[in-house]
């Protein structure tokens, strides 16, 4: 496990974007051998997408041979709805880079057969071998994608009922009206995430501090989905200072010294 303790959320976004670009460029993708990138939605990764767009515009990276898989999508929300994850991804990222439309994969929450859609999604991921890098965020309760507390750590892509806490948290995108938030979503599973070659979680803000503590210092258990990343060979937590408030001082000190070069790469 790696923990990259930075000062601000802006530094987290810059570090994450640079890491993604470095991974893509080192991989040197082609049409026959694309780089497979897993992506989240939500407020935390928004600035990272802006940084990636800047790097693309500066001609430091191309997404022409990048294949993407998104983590989740609401059930029953039309794709053209401004708060659908289809709309989010196109408005905030895909419309601004050179990714090929056929390389974009987002779960269809409006299909008549949700189980078949989830099975198809898993098979599509497998057809590429693996996801090379999966970027994600984390909820205040430690959930990743829509794998809420008590989700099976062996779970695969499936339909999930959203918790009351998640409905309340997401109501800020729906005029602060909980009744407008879809009650169900299609989501990748915890095991789907763990199958990725590398997982990078962005953790920012004091309200995520308990989740980060559970992920780094806590025991692996299904009430804290984030803790499953302790089982992953290449997991990276990129966090700002407020998110480290619940970690032991010696934990932060250890990773600050260990990742000194990585930290300074975004500060220089």
UniProtKB/Swiss-Prot annotation:
<comment type="subunit">
    <text>Homohexamer.</text>
</comment>
<feature type="active site" description="Proton acceptor; for enolization step">
    <location>
        <position position="72"/>
    </location>
</feature>
<feature type="active site" description="For ring-opening step">
    <location>
        <position position="148"/>
    </location>
</feature>
<keyword id="KW-0021">Allosteric enzyme</keyword>
<dbReference type="GO" id="GO:0005975">
    <property type="term" value="P:carbohydrate metabolic process"/>
</dbReference>
<dbReference type="Pfam" id="PF01182">
    <property type="entry name" value="Glucosamine_iso"/>
</dbReference>
<feature type="site" description="Part of the allosteric site">
    <location>
        <position position="158"/>
    </location>
</feature>
<dbReference type="GO" id="GO:0042802">
    <property type="term" value="F:identical protein binding"/>
</dbReference>
<dbReference type="InterPro" id="IPR004547">
    <property type="entry name" value="Glucosamine6P_isomerase"/>
</dbReference>
<feature type="site" description="Part of the allosteric site">
    <location>
        <position position="254"/>
    </location>
</feature>
<dbReference type="GO" id="GO:0006043">
    <property type="term" value="P:glucosamine catabolic process"/>
</dbReference>
<dbReference type="InterPro" id="IPR018321">
    <property type="entry name" value="Glucosamine6P_isomerase_CS"/>
</dbReference>
<keyword id="KW-0378">Hydrolase</keyword>
<keyword id="KW-0119">Carbohydrate metabolism</keyword>
<dbReference type="GO" id="GO:0019262">
    <property type="term" value="P:N-acetylneuraminate catabolic process"/>
</dbReference>
<protein>
    <recommendedName>
        <fullName>Glucosamine-6-phosphate deaminase</fullName>
        <ecNumber>3.5.99.6</ecNumber>
    </recommendedName>
</protein>
<feature type="site" description="Part of the allosteric site">
    <location>
        <position position="151"/>
    </location>
</feature>
<comment type="pathway">
    <text>Amino-sugar metabolism; N-acetylneuraminate degradation; D-fructose 6-phosphate from N-acetylneuraminate: step 5/5.</text>
</comment>
<feature type="site" description="Part of the allosteric site">
    <location>
        <position position="161"/>
    </location>
</feature>
<dbReference type="GO" id="GO:0005737">
    <property type="term" value="C:cytoplasm"/>
</dbReference>
<feature type="site" description="Part of the allosteric site">
    <location>
        <position position="160"/>
    </location>
</feature>
<dbReference type="InterPro" id="IPR006148">
    <property type="entry name" value="Glc/Gal-6P_isomerase"/>
</dbReference>
<comment type="function">
    <text>Catalyzes the reversible isomerization-deamination of glucosamine 6-phosphate (GlcN6P) to form fructose 6-phosphate (Fru6P) and ammonium ion.</text>
</comment>
<dbReference type="GO" id="GO:0006046">
    <property type="term" value="P:N-acetylglucosamine catabolic process"/>
</dbReference>
<comment type="similarity">
    <text>Belongs to the glucosamine/galactosamine-6-phosphate isomerase family. NagB subfamily.</text>
</comment>
<dbReference type="GO" id="GO:0004342">
    <property type="term" value="F:glucosamine-6-phosphate deaminase activity"/>
</dbReference>
<feature type="active site" description="For ring-opening step">
    <location>
        <position position="141"/>
    </location>
</feature>
<feature type="active site" description="Proton acceptor; for ring-opening step">
    <location>
        <position position="143"/>
    </location>
</feature>
<dbReference type="InterPro" id="IPR037171">
    <property type="entry name" value="NagB/RpiA_transferase-like"/>
</dbReference>
